[in-house]
């Protein structure tokens, strides 16, 4: 299954300024994400950013990067613009790897592409098991699987559906390019706004989302200084 990877990266972060350029044991955060993505079977890997500083950094480390608009309503809008800039064909599959996941498992990227192909799906994503502290944490998005990898619903509240069946959603997606362009043309839905979850826009418009369990060992999104310190510890352990 042929696919491409796009990694959104923004400098603006209220909790961790200049996040993509933070050093993690000798490599920047964005460099570590790119390195992992390149270990997948992706046809190409690009960083999509609104920052000339990140563009310059990517040039220094030999990474393909494109400059997008500063203001987008969602990350999916930025992804859609990126596909237009890169002139990707409408039937191509794009895996959206978050720019703050330095230990993303390349197998997860490949497996998402396989899932999208096997289900003929326009939108696919990943999940893993919840740990105790995450059950009540509204910053941790939950999902429920209905059958045959189909997502029943997403919520920040584990009691939204059966709590024992809730899984931790990992914000890594696969989309077909033509679906991306359709998605950004839809108005924000009520559930999207109420839950602050952009994937609800797809579900509220009747689109099925499929998900598989991650095979990765580490699921760390670097959002705070404490996350950064943990990432440094993991990187040292893996070196």
Q: Could you describe each region identified by the protein language model?
A:
Residues 106-191:
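Conserved core of the sugar-phosphate nucleotidyltransferase
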Residues 42, 90-91, 119-121, 207:
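Short, high-confidence coil segments that cap the C-terminus of an alpha-helix
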